[in-house]
Amino acid sequence: MTLKIGGIVPIVRVMRDTIIQRPVSTFVRYHSKRSRSFKKKANHKPGQVIRSKLGKTLEAPKTQPKLFSFGNFSGLDQPENKLKEMSSNAIKNITSFESLRIFPTVRSAMLEEIKYGYNLKSTYIKSKEELEIKPSPVQIAAIRKINQPRLRNVNAEKKLADKKASGQEILEDLQKSNEMNRLKIFTIAAETGSGKTWAYLAPLLSKLKEEDMRVFNMSEQSYADAKKTSIIRSVILLPTHELVEQVYDSLKRASKASIDLEASVNKKILQDPQYARYLSLPENQTSLNLNVVKWGSGDSHQKLFDAGRKRIDVLVTTPAKIQGLAKLNNVSRPFRLFNFVEYCVVDEADTLMDKSWIVDTTSVIRRLSKCKDLIFCSATIPKEFKKTLGKMFPDEFSIINIVTPSLHKIPKQINLKVIDAQLSPYNGSKTRCLAQALYAIHNDGTEQGYVKRILVFVNEKRDVQPLADTLIEKFGHREEDIIGITGADNADDRLAKIEPFLKPAELLEEDLDGSKVKVLITTDLLARGLNFNGIKNVILMDLPNTSVDLVHRVGRTGRMRQSGRVFVIIDKKTGKSWIKGLPKVIKKGIPLG
């Protein structure tokens, strides 16, 4: 006897005393007309009581979440429901950054930086001062977990009637010391464009400021000496120099953001003796005053050593740059600045932990012997990434996983359309299909008065320039409007080319090129983490190779709850029947597998 319940096909075995339902598949399959059809659905619903032939009853199990999973589009790991539920409950109860444990001046600087990057176009808000910034789900979940005190009630008075033996006191002191210094590993996974950067920056900067305040309140001289030490306190690792620039710019703006203590910090905090003394320092009156250093493409090792003559609070770089120090045969102890790093963030971890990067990334991590917090942050959790972490840290309880309920789901505010190049008038030409899509976007009446920016993704870098040339020569696009980028371009050229796409859209009359539409053609090189400010349209010229790539490409639009459109162009070779089900998958909120 076979039933189909809620999209799951279970096998039902009628035994003497019980009914056993064994799930066979939790995947959603989209079949072509020629594929075999399933048997008609039974009327049983999840949670319904089923009566057996012998009169025994058993409640039907609730169905597991459906997945959109096919072939190479099945490489994503699905977190346990319990983990998502825990995160969901916390998210429901918190609606303000004031409810989160963030150092007061860090909170103020963070809000100013978030407002700076907010796109007011197409909103009713006239100025950024009117914005009410609320934490996103991933920010709530991550800040709560990472900023939890390592020791609770450390300063509470002992309530034991009898004085403890000296041996017991020594043991407790050792246990406290171990707890304060042991390595804690966090993974942060949330949908693209959800605010993950500040999900790890807020705890990181808070810990740095709290440590400064602790040292200052112990001894002003110790605090002054600590600021002169030649060390790096924290490191943020990123896969590309574009991302290094992006994260560094956010940190620099936050570090230099103007802070009005009276206006932005709670009066109770200002009256707290430990905060009052530290915040009264002139250096804390107007900004975070943190030393943030970028070590990017083209920067010599000497730049790092020069910056390290005074304490570096945050270093933003790539794993390859740090590992490059090993080649300096004429420099004594080239890694000496990293001996006291206490906090390390591996951003875009699904990339930095794949086979192309893992050797450099893990080599850097191994050098951080004093690290207390190691944070892996990503928009996806590939199965291979989870296996790699399991090998690195065999004790599963040593890893604290932080996920959001919408992980691996394409945001519903993204409108995805599949265009079949086999149909008339394209007649099998994907390039003609692309040209028509660009024309339609240009004339659709949206973003009036602004230069429209469009991202086009292809799978191979060898296709970038030929496609750009075809759009210019055959379809009449201006050369200054079609921009192609590959890994062959040096980092400075890439930054110059993508600048119009990273900043808010310009008014038509202010664009120096006189452009009405700008098109950026690239590969997955630029699909990871970059915040393309206010981009409304993304075109996938080629079907991505995996669901990981699909999530990242689509995630260049629809960021921070803003709307976006994605056009997927298919032909006879890539026009699988299941790909046409993607729009429904998004509308129904089904995660990718």
From Swiss-Prot:
Amino-acid positions noted as binding ATP in the UniProt annotation, renumbered to this chain: 190-197
Record-linked InterPro entries: DEAD/DEAH_box_helicase_dom, Helicase_ATP-bd, Helicase_C-like, P-loop_NTPase
Its biological purpose: ATP-binding RNA helicase involved in mitochondrial RNA metabolism. Required for maintenance of mitochondrial DNA.
Gene this chain is encoded by: MRH4
Stretch forming the transit peptide: 1-36
Location in or out of the cell: Mitochondrion
Motif DEAD box, residue numbers: 347-350
GO MF annotation terms: ATP binding; ATP hydrolysis activity; RNA binding; RNA helicase activity
Name of protein: ATP-dependent RNA helicase MRH4, mitochondrial
Keyword entries, A-Z: ATP-binding, Helicase, Hydrolase, Mitochondrion, Nucleotide-binding, RNA-binding, Transit peptide
Species name: Debaryomyces hansenii (strain ATCC 36239 / CBS 767 / BCRC 21394 / JCM 1990 / NBRC 0083 / IGC 2968)
Residue span(s) of domain Helicase ATP-binding: 177-399
UniProt record similarity statement: Belongs to the DEAD box helicase family. MRH4 subfamily.
SUPFAM superfamilies: P-loop containing nucleoside triphosphate hydrolases
Chief location: mitochondrion
